[in-house]
């Protein structure tokens, strides 16, 4: 993970090199992936209302710092590989309404600072159309805001030639 200052410095450097910018909020003190969605230590002990507010404030703070540095990310990912949710345990898919409230706080914070940035919701196992369908059907049912579907696909971890095109075409 990177601090806000490190993120801004890298984004400025990448933009100066002509690269398109994507920011990925893991909302964790360490790498977040399907098996690890531990919220930051500083957020432990917060009630759900406080957790929503701190997620919004953190996202807005980073996005505003990027804007102030002249960087407009083309894409912003709210959560990293979140098939079972993010910011555990409150943001688990065991409680879709709460997860969607957190996702929407991230979305709103991004759009407030950078209206043109496209917000991504990112799920792994792109070859598993049933999983994608279940996840995005629930996200839609509960009102999740997003602009783009993000998909991870790791063929070297899978047997045979798994097909990811069903998830893309669906």
What spans do the regions from the language model cover?
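Conserved, mostly hydrophobic/aromatic
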Residues: 24, 76, 149
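Conserved residues at the C-terminal ends of beta-strands
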Residues: 1, 79, 152
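Short, flexible active-site loops
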Residues: 150-156
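Active-site cleft segment of glycoside hydrolase catalytic domains centered on the general acid/base Glu
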Residues: 4-5, 33-146, 158-169
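Positions that flank functional sites
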Residues: 28-29, 81, 154
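N-terminal carbohydrate-binding/catalytic regions of secreted carbohydrate-active enzymes
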Residues: 1-16, 20
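Glycine-rich, aromatic-flanked loop segments that form ligand/cofactor-binding clefts
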Residues: 14-32
């Amino acid at each position: 993970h990177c601090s806000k200052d490190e993120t801004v410095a890298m984004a400025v450097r990448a933009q100066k090199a002509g690269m398109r910018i994507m920011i990925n909020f893991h909302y964790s003190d360490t790498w977040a992936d399907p098996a690890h969605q531990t919220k930051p230590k500083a957020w432990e002990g917060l009630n759900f209302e406080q957790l929503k507010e701190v997620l919004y404030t953190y996202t807005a703070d980073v996005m505003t710092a990027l804007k102030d540095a002249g960087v407009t990310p083309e894409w912003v990912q709210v959560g990293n590989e979140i098939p079972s949710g993010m910011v555990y345990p409150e943001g688990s898919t065991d409680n879709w309404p709460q997860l969607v409230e957190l996702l929407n706080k991230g979305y709103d914070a991004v759009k407030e600072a950078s209206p043109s940035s496209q917000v991504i919701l990112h799920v792994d196992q792109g070859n598993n159309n049933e999983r994608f369908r279940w996840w995005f059907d629930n996200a839609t049912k509960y009102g999740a805001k997003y602009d783009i579907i993000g998909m991870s696909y790791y063929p070297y971890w899978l047997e045979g030639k798994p097909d990811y095109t069903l998830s893309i075409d669906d």
